[in-house]
Design a protein with these regions (language model features):
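Short hydrophobic targeting helices and cationic amphipathic motifs
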Residues: 5-7
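Short, positively charged and aromatic/hydrophobic N-terminal segments
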Residues: 9-22
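C-terminal substrate-binding subdomain of Rossmann-fold SDR/epimerase-dehydratase oxidoreductases
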Residues: 12, 42-46, 50, 57, ...
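N-terminal Rossmann-like NAD(P)+-binding domain of SDR-like oxidoreductases, especially those catalyzing
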Residues: 19, 23-219, 269, 298, ...
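Tryptophan-centric aromatic hotspots in well-structured domains and transmembrane helices
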Residues: 65, 114, 125, 177, ...
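A glycine/serine/threonine-rich, flexible loop-to-helix segment
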Residues: 75, 173, 226-234
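Residue-level recognition of oxygen-bearing side chains
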Residues: 93, 124, 131, 225-229, ...
Length: 387
């Protein structure tokens, strides 16, 4: 049965020393932070699909607005899955997880991640993204370090970051972000992620701490909270609401289907050279306005003529709003290194990925309705309706 822990509130038993049914050997144990969020939950689904009962996953998540246990409903009864409700800034809670479990791998997703929210409330981004990462690093170091300063064999910490730390690229199709590109963050969010990246780099350099960093482009796919562009446009179009576009709509982003990202993270864990950074990009660069047109066209293709929503989904819904402060013009990742060293490449082209994403939201309208109620609606009104 599932173990579910609420540190600081209710403490239930946690299964320890789980054995692999196939050969009796100890399962490799993954500690996944932020696993109830968009990318984290997709990663957990991917890992269980690939490894089934060969691994054990402990998912720690504070369940803030974007964390949702509904994302993991189909894995919650697995004996090799444990959920822990805790904040990564809580040193005692995180230390307890390491003390009570032989953690082999840490996959650190947990972060505040929405640029607009960081502009409105930067302090929480510094606290979670910088302090929280420091707590995770310290607890992992304390658990894994051997006398003399070396580390236990087979341990690895993977810090999941963003291409936004690199700043903005010019409107030049030949300009890309590489692992050697200097950091130049322009928002409180990207500055907080750049700071957390630097902490991980410092631990690798100072302590020879076993870690990797991945910097990914914009993700899309199932379970994404609708403050982000693609689910926002899908949801608004289906409800006949305006489709807000910042500025002139010509900002460019590189889009990566979330399952491709999950695969990349697994491959870096298994094959990546320690202490290295790997850029993970989708080679799907598109202007924001182009994304909106593609979503409108795809909805028109997928909805039957009998669906009354089809009639009002058109370009008339597009509404240009005041541009975001410090809005970076273009992001584009060159994933050459991860392809050459590990053999990873993005498998999902955008047309296929957006079709799968829209199909998922069609099949999970209750999920969308649940997450767009309450506080989200208040936030949405402040961000878009009042502009």
């Amino acid at each position: 049965m599932i173990s579910c822990l609420f540190y600081g509130k209710i403490s239930l038993s946690i299964t320890k020393n789980v054995r692999c049914a196939q050969n009796g050997e100890k399962m490799r144990t993954y500690l996944v932070t932020g696993g109830a969020g968009f990318i984290g939950s997709n990663y957990i689904h991917y890992m269980f699909k690939k490894y089934d009962n060969e691994i054990r996953i402990i998912n720690v998540d504070a369940l803030t607005y974007a964390g949702n246990l509904e994302n993991l409903k189909d894995v919650e009864k697995r004996e090799n899955y444990t959920f822990v409700k805790a904040n990564i800034c809580d040193k005692d809670a995180i230390s307890k997880i390491f003390t009570e479990n032989d953690i082999d791998r840490v996959v650190h997703f947990a972060a505040e991640s929405h640029v607009d929210r960081s502009i409105r409330n930067p302090e929480i981004f510094v606290q979670t993204n910088v302090l929280g990462t420091a707590v995770m690093l310290n607890c992992a170091k304390a658990a894994w370090e051997l006398p003399g300063g070396s580390f236990k064999e087979g341990k690895k910490f993977l810090h999941v970051s963003t291409d936004e730390v690199y700043g903005s690229l010019p409107d030049d199709d030949n300009a890309f972000f590489y692992e050697t590109t200097p950091y130049d963050p322009h928002s409180p969010y990207s500055a907080s992620k750049a700071s957390s990246d630097m902490l991980v780099k410092a631990y690798m350099d100072t302590y020879h701490f076993p870690a990797n960093i991945t910097n990914c482009s914009n993700n899309y796919g199932p379970f994404q909270f609708p403050e982000k562009l693609i689910p926002l446009i899908i949801n608004n179009a289906l409800h006949g609401k305006k489709l807000p576009v910042y500025g002139d709509g010509k900002n460019v982003r590189d889009w990566l289907y979330v399952e491709d990202h999950a695969k990349a993270i697994d491959m870096v864990q298994e094959q990546g050279r320690l202490f290295e950074t790997y850029n993970v990009g989708g080679h799907n660069e598109k202007q924001n306005i182009e994304i909106i047109h593609i979503i409108i066209e795809t909805l028109q293709e997928m909805l039957p003529d009998s669906d009354p929503r089809k009639a009002h989904i058109n370009n008339d819904l597009i509404t240009y709003v005041e541009d975001r402060k410090g809005h970076d013009r273009r992001y584009a990742i060159a994933p050459d290194k991860i392809k050459a060293e590990i053999g990873w490449y993005p498998e999902t082209m955008f047309k296929e990925g957006i079709h799968k994403t829209i199909a998922w939201y069609f099949e999970h309208e209750d999920w969308m309705n649940n997450v767009t109620s309450g506080d989200y609606q208040k936030y949405y009104n402040e961000m878009y309706e009042e502009k």
